[in-house]
Amino acid sequence: MAPVGVEKKLLLGPNGPAVAAAGDLTSEEEEGQSLWSSILSEVSTRARSKLPSGKNILVFGEDGSGKTTLMTKLQGAEHGKKGRGLEYLYLSVHDEDRDDHTRCNVWILDGDLYHKGLLKFAVSAESLPETLVIFVADMSRPWTVMESLQKWASVLREHIDKMKIPPEKMRELERKFVKDFQDYMEPEEGCQGSPQRRGPLTSGSDEENVALPLGDNVLTHNLGIPVLVVCTKCDAVSVLEKEHDYRDEHLDFIQSHLRRFCLQYGAALIYTSVKEEKNLDLLYKYIVHKTYGFHFTTPALVVEKDAVFIPAGWDNEKKIAILHENFTTVKPEDAYEDFIVKPPVRKLVHDKELAAEDEQVFLMKQQSLLAKQPATPTRASESPARGPSGSPRTQGRGGPASVPSSSPGTSVKKPDPNIKNNAASEGVLASFFNSLLSKKTGSPGSPGAGGVQSTAKKSGQKTVLSNVQEELDRMTRKPDSMVTNSSTENEA
């Protein structure tokens, strides 16, 4: 047996220390290379797992449907500015697991069809696979819902056809969309974080991998991209029930037609309300789930009539038929516009508000109107002269003949103690009439023949004045004669 030192020398050889040093360097280089490889692998993995950019959301809807307000609310802004033509904003998307951020482009088309040509600036043939479409329907006006959805769906179909996408690429998009629709699986109850879509199956029989065939009227209008139907202003359901006498039958009829439309396009359906902030968070989560593949664990919601949520791939004709069980006055196949009728336009008649005019202003206007009235030649003679009793007397009835004379044979009335008061009031009346006549006489006459007319006026006015004065004198003398006659009769 060789000594230990000899064994070491034999193992190391004549240049033993140098060979050992070279071996140590080789191991260090291998460790360094493995470290760099792990770093590069981690970087490449992060690059692959980074949130993709360039995702688009295309929003359609009528003017006043609340589409801009809805997307602004999802953006987190309090107030949005209404634009024209084609509006743009973005949604901030944050992945907490990867600590990554990105922006999702949002394009909102104007409700006027005149601006549909602007779609070419929002979505192209290259960006179509990265696009999610949202059709907005106004539930405060349910009679416009189906017509609006059909209109905007045809606009989108027309725009896709104009892109002239190669048939092979378009068929690939359609096949992928059908697969996503068929692969829908309801999330397990109480399982948080489980994906809504079924991932690669690691176990199970081959029967689980077989996709079920599409039913009737399902994906008959395949656009190749995910579609979402959002009903806004669902808080107006209570208003429809009060003002338009809507019942559960009306709401179920509307929902059944909406779900049939969604089946044709493979779309999801969600009822929202910005006013009550209902289903807004659910809408945002579903959008990022369909766009970026985030986990989504909310099942379908069909209990609340104003907070419905139907994910794409969950619905079918049998589930929709459950709504038909409550129909009593309508049939499922009836036309939408025959049962959901547009109410007649009520013209609001507002009573005109009359502002009370100031009293002094009113009197000044009346004074100016009276001053502008021209005086006519017969105006003075036609003015009524009122007697002590207040009854009007015309010129023809005036004069001494109008006063009945007392005859000796007639019975004389007893003197009235109020005669003196009547005489005083008669004086006031006389001064009033004289002031009126003096005003009338002050109006200027026309030149030329005005001399004759003014003379006639003055003579007529003097006659009236004399008649009035004589009448007043006679009335004042009447009490004295009555007293004298009564005293004479008593003496006799």
UniProtKB/Swiss-Prot annotation:
The keyword Phosphoprotein appears for this protein: yes
GO molecular function: ATP binding; dynein heavy chain binding; identical protein binding
Region (Disordered): 187-206, 371-423, 437-492
Bias (Low complexity): 400-412
Residues binding ATP: G61, E62, D63, G64, S65, G66, K67, T68
Keywords for this protein: ATP-binding, Cytoplasm, Cytoskeleton, Dynein, Methylation, Microtubule, Motor protein, Nucleotide-binding, Phosphoprotein, Transport
Name by which UniProt lists this protein: Cytoplasmic dynein 1 light intermediate chain 2
Protein's organism: Homo sapiens (Human)
Lineage summary: Eukaryota, Metazoa, Chordata, Craniata, Vertebrata
